[in-house]
């Protein structure tokens, strides 16, 4: 699927729950986008997909590196990727932190496909530069 003169956006899903990853991937593909899945923030950070990602859907609470820590890492690398957070926990402090740091949305599980679609549409707003892959300064960075 082409969007104007730009390639089909790649949406990356980072969640330690495989069933959540699979469900979101199926939905993303059903609306015509490419989807890549990662079981951890670390796997996403070392993947070649990072530089192709137009939108990141990430769980807040994961082992080793949380979604908020991933957001902070990407910010420190100057990666401009729109982020949609998802969580099963009612955590107003995490929500406030994520949105203050520039997250597109913060969805509480279970959320509807319409909720996710609206967040994706905001993240991929063609008025901005969101359909373009991420831009990052990664040289010399470690996680």
Residue map of PLM features:
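The C-terminal output helix
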Residues: 121-136
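Receiver (REC) domain active-site loop signature in two-component systems and cognate sites
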Residues: 62
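Two-component/phosphorelay signaling modules centered on CheY-like receiver
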Residues: 18-36, 123
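Acidic, metal-coordinating helix/loop segments flanking the phosphotransfer/catalytic sites
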Residues: 37-55
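Acidic catalytic/metal-coordinating carboxylates
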Residues: 39-40, 66-70
